[in-house]
């Protein structure tokens, strides 16, 4: 991939164009970091605070970053024509190999939030060889039933679309207090994202099916994510229950569950420092950036105890041979057979 590809691109896929923003250039055979935002947002609203954080920029110097905007959600997007059929959540996932192939990425580390986390999880289930690892924030692995559907419809009749989306993004406490962050996002969701296009994405997300994953050993031929996963959710966030359930369905030997206090519904916005630290240890556990210098350590600071535990957990549960110099780590062993039924394993859970 030439360095001149840094910037914005519209990529042809089987289900329409995808707006993609590339930052940086490939570093050897290292994976790309690929992001996917939540419904109501775009890559800027969802990830700018996180990726502009100083310590996060120290990390991303070692990778090319690929930000994906869901169809019609980018800044300045044209409104879809009447009768346009928005891609299903499965089709959104099936659009991503076109992006990977277009830029010549061998595999990616995905960072997704909410609807974007669901899309990336589905992508990893369908195309496991393309995904090296996943950071899934606020993921809900469950489909919407009739009661949920009716509640969503009723909410749409009594609330504006931005307010309906805000109740998905933020905790009840944040909404009641009407924090500056909530006010800012209400304004930006109303003015930056095309409302008709957003309604289509919102409707499709609320029509999603179950991810259909089960923890290995709980049922014969269990299907689950085969790559290392870090689950992230804020205390009392709307997605907390869904993330807890997702954690129960993943392989505990390759999963870390990070519950962040005082972070509300958007931990990547409210606690970018803590999330960056966790992401750094997640990457180091996979064998990447082992020698990355922490800017704060030179001033005498030390990593928090919870982050140290996370680092030990990742290092103990994930084995990688020579990825520090750019080659791919050995994939985690995974079996879809019924061997090991009844084994009791515990995911590494960290609160910070």
Swiss-Prot record:
Subcellular location, in the record's words?
Cytoplasm, Cytosol
For region Disordered, the annotated ranges are 301-352
* A biological process term (GO) from this entry: negative regulation of smooth muscle cell proliferation
According to its UniProt record, where is this protein mainly located? cytoplasm
Q: Where is the composition biased (Low complexity)?
A: 308-323
Q: Which residues carry this modification: Phosphoserine?
A: 298, 317, 323
Effect of disrupting the coding gene: Mutant mice have impaired spatial learning and memory but normal motor function.
Keywords recorded for this protein, A-Z: Cytoplasm, Phosphoprotein
One Gene Ontology cellular component term attached to this UniProt record is: cell projection membrane
* Comp. bias intervals (Polar residues): 338-352
- Keyword Cell division included in the entry's annotation: no
Q: Name the InterPro entries on file.
A: AB_hydrolase_fold, NDRG
Q: Which domain of life is it from?
A: Eukaryota
Presence of keyword NAD? no
Give the tissue specificity.
Predominantly expressed in the brain (at protein level). Detected in neurons of various parts of brain, including the olfactory bulb, olfactory tuberculum, cerebral cortex, striatum, hippocampus, dentate gyrus, thalamus, hypothalamus, mesencephalon, cerebellum, pons and medulla oblongata.
Instruction: Extract the PANTHER family matched here.
Output: N-MYC DOWNSTREAM REGULATED
Summarizing the function annotation, the protein's role is: Contributes to the maintenance of intracerebral BDNF levels within the normal range, which is necessary for the preservation of spatial learning and the resistance to neuronal cell death caused by ischemic stress. May enhance growth factor-induced ERK1 and ERK2 phosphorylation. May attenuate NGF-promoted ELK1 phosphorylation in a microtubule-dependent manner.
Family classification: Belongs to the NDRG family.
Q: What is this protein called?
A: Protein NDRG4
The organism encoding this protein is: Mus musculus (Mouse)
